[in-house]
């Protein structure tokens, strides 16, 4: 974990982001402070004594070290309420039982470490293709590609994302080869018959919008489950986010820091093969804070009081 792994994956904990975001101190106005205090009191009144919000807890200085984020798309927008068990891996029902198969295969994949795996419930997305029977949909970041995967192909898909099976160099083209574009594929094929296979194993479809994830893993922690829908409502009311997809995501760490958000910003959509993406992590976000937080983002500013760290891909 930490700097060594970021270096290994060619990533950095960035101070200079692709999109030009700058960290700023913004003092909340008095009405916002009062609204936040009221929200905390209301939430804590509905939460068990051992599971209450503590706004005095300091935020961590960096997000988890990861190179890729794979999101299993839940079939329904409200699936986070009843279908997400405390640990998704223990859910025996399709499509959530794909999580345990996928994560187990990643353990033996060539580049299987450093991949976050979560479920997501999109709140009214129009970008996703129609789900076919017996298939699951995965959104892969930072490439912003959606994959439609048959239930018997989950393990093979994990090896595709993870660069092949085993710790030896893969003998066929994997996900990174296709994410890097046709020129890279041609170069790999020229290395010899043992280095490539003809054609992709899985074909993704582009997901051409920024993405804002709100942690709402209700059965894992009541705090996130209570705050998430109100955060989503507040975010939907922001004009700046009209072209941003909003989703409720399973556990992303730090329930004591609820509400937790991740903002994936495509800095330059013209990079079709490999988008330049900034991932900004936020914590202790309350609905009353959303206008201030989003207004800052619209000006390429990051509110320091809620910032958990960021990565440039």
Curated annotation (Swiss-Prot):
Cellular component GO terms held in the UniProt record: mitochondrial intermembrane space; mitochondrial matrix
One Gene Ontology biological process: protein-containing complex assembly
Organism: Eremothecium gossypii (strain ATCC 10895 / CBS 109.51 / FGSC 9923 / NRRL Y-1056)
UniProt name for this protein: Altered inheritance of mitochondria protein 32
Pfam families hit by this protein: Suc_Fer-like (PF06999)
Protein family: Belongs to the AIM32 family.
């Amino acid at each position: 974990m930490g700097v060594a792994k970021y270096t290994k994956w060619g990533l950095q904990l960035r101070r200079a982001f692709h999109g030009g975001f700058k960290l700023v101190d913004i003092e909340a106005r008095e009405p916002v402070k009062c609204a936040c205090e009221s929200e905390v009191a209301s939430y804590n009144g509905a939460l068990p004594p051992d599971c209450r919000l503590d706004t005095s807890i300091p935020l961590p200085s960096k997000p988890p070290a990861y190179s890729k984020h794979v999101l299993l798309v839940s079939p329904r927008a409200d699936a986070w309420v009843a279908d997400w068990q405390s640990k998704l891996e223990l859910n025996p029902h399709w499509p959530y039982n794909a999580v345990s198969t996928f994560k187990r295969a990643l353990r033996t994949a060539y580049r299987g470490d450093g991949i976050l795996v979560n479920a997501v419930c999109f709140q009214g997305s129009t970008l996703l293709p129609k789900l076919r029977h017996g298939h699951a949909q995965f959104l892969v970041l930072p490439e912003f590609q959606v994959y439609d995967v048959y239930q018997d192909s989950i393990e093979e898909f994990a090896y595709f994302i993870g660069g092949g099976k085993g710790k030896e160099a893969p003998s066929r083209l994997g996900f990174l080869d296709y994410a890097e574009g046709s020129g890279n594929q041609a170069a790999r094929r020229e290395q010899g018959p043992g280095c490539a296979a003809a054609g992709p194993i899985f074909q993704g479809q582009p997901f051409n919008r920024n993405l804002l994830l709100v942690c709402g893993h209700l059965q894992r922690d009541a705090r996130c489950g209570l705050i998430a829908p109100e955060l989503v409502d507040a975010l939907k009311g922001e004009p700046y986010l009209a072209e941003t997809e909003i989703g409720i995501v399973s556990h992303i760490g730090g329930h004591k820091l609820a509400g937790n958000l991740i903002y994936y910003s495509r800095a330059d959509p013209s990079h079709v093969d490999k988008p330049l993406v900034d991932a900004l992590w936020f914590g202790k976000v309350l609905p009353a804070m959303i206008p201030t937080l989003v207004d800052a983002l619209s000006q390429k500013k990051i509110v320091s009081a809620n910032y958990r760290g960021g990565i440039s891909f």
